Design a protein with these regions (language model features):
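Canonical Rossmann dinucleotide-binding motif of NAD(H)/NADP(H)-dependent dehydrogenases/reductases
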Residues: 2-34
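Active-site-adjacent segment of SDR/Rossmann-fold oxidoreductases
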Residues: 29, 160, 169, 181-191, ...
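The beta1-alpha1 cofactor-binding region of Rossmann-like NAD(H)/NADP(H)-dependent oxidoreductases
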Residues: 40-41, 63-75
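Amphipathic alpha-helical dimer-interface segment in Rossmann-like NAD(P)H-dependent oxidoreductases
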Residues: 77, 81, 120-144, 183-184
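Catalytic Tyr-X3-Lys loop
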Residues: 95, 107-130, 151, 175
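Conserved mid-core segment of classical short-chain dehydrogenase/reductases
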Residues: 96-116, 141-145, 164-167
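Residue(s) in the substrate-gating loop at a strand-loop-helix junction
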Residues: 155
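C-terminal helical subdomain
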Residues: 195, 211-259, 270
C-alpha cells in the first residue's frame, strides 16, 4: 500500500501531538485525511491549515470521542459514505493518567474507585476503532496486496514496567496484545494491523513541558518513518515497532516457554474459540 495512489485515511486524536504529526504526514502526501478529535476548535483550525498548505490533499475534521461507540460509529459511517472507502486508520487517540495513579493508594482511609478514563480512551477506544475500521475495509474488493491497514498507537510503556503510571501501561500492554492477536484473523480478509510503541516524544499528553527536561527525546520524524514503513509494506502485520531515538525496531512476540504451550495455543487457534 504505497503512497502513489490517494488513500482515504482516518486519524483518531489527529488534532494534536502524535496524531497531528500523522495528519500532517498523510496530508503532505496528498491523501484524503479525516481528523477525529475531541477538541472541535483546534481540530477544525488544523484541518483548514493543512488544506491550505496541501491543496492536493483533502483534509476534513469531525469532533469525535473514541470512548463513545455511537459517536465513533457515526463518524466512520460519515467518512465511508462521503469517500466510498477507508484505506488507512490510525487508532491513535490517547490520554495519560494525569498525576498520581489511582490504581493503588495505600494512604486512603477508605478505598476510592480507580479513575479508568485511561482504559476508556486508550484501550476501549482502540477496540472500537479497530472494529469499525475492519468493517469498512472489508467492504472493499480483495486485491493482491491489501484491503486496508490499521496502525495502533501503543507505547514503550506497553513493553516495559512503568510503575509511575500502571493503568496507562496496562492500557498500552492491551493495545499490543490486541494487535498481535488480531493479525491472523484480519489477514484472512486482506487487512493488516500493526502497532507503534514510541519512547518519549514531546507532546501535549504530558501535564507540563517540565516533564521532558531531563529526558532523552525521540524525534517525531522517527515515528513517522515507522508509519511510512508499515504503509509501504503490506507483508507486515501483527508487528510492534518500537520507536526510539533515530531507530525503528520491530519487536517480536515472546517465545513460547515450551512445546506444550505452543501446542495448546495452536489447538485454540484451530478450534476457533477459547
Amino acid at each position: 500500500m504505497g503512497s502513489a495512489q490517494m488513500k482515504s485515511v482516518i486519524v483518531t486524536g489527529g488534532g494534536s501531538g502524535i496524531g497531528l504529526a500523522m495528519s500532517r504526514h498523510f496530508a503532505s502526501e496528498g491523501h484524503n485525511v479525516a481528523i477525529f478529535d475531541v477538541n472541535a476548535e483546534s481540530g477544525a483550525k488544523i484541518a483548514s491549515e493543512l488544506s491550505s498548505k496541501h491543496p492536493n490533499a483533502t483534509v476534513t475534521f469531525r469532533k469525535s470521542d473514541v470512548s463513545s461507540w455511537d459517536d465513533l460509529a457515526a463518524a466512520f459511517k460519515e467518512v465511508y459514505e462521503q469517500r466510498g472507502s477507508i484505506d488507512i486508520v490510525m487508532a491513535n487517540a490517547g490520554v495519560s493518567e494525569q498525576g498520581s495513579s489511582s490504581a493503588v493508594d495505600l494512604s486512603e482511609a477508605e478505598p476510592t474507585k480507580p479513575r479508568l478514563k485511561v482504559f476508556d480512551v486508550n484501550l476501549t477506544g482502540v477496540v472500537y476503532t479497530v472494529k469499525l475500521a475492519s468493517h469498512y475495509m472489508n467492504r472493499k474488493p480483495k486485491t493482491a496486496n491489501s484491503r486496508g491497514l490499521i496502525i495502533c498507537t501503543a507505547s514503550n510503556a506497553g513493553l516495559y514496567p512503568f510503575p509511575v503510571a500502571p493503568l496507562y501501561a496496562t492500557s498500552k500492554f492491551g493495545v499490543i496484545g490486541l494487535v498481535r492477536s488480531l493479525a491472523a484473523p484480519l489477514a484472512q480478509h486482506g487487512i493488516q494491523i500493526n502497532g507503534l510503541a514510541p519512547a518519549v516524544i514531546e507532546t501535549n499528553i504530558a501535564p507540563s513541558k517540565d516533564l521532558f527536561k531531563d529526558m532523552v527525546i525521540t524525534p517525531m520524524e522517527t515515528l513517522i518513518r515507522g508509519v511510512a514503513q508499515f504503509v509501504a509494506d503490506p507483508s507486515l502485520s501483527g508487528e510492534i515497532a518500537e520507536i526510539h531515538g533515530s531507530e525503528v525496531t520491530l519487536r517480536p512476540p515472546h517465545e513460547y516457554a515450551d512445546a506444550d504451550t505452543k501446542k495448546n495455543i495452536d489447538v485454540f487457534n484451530s478450534l476457533g474459540y477459547a
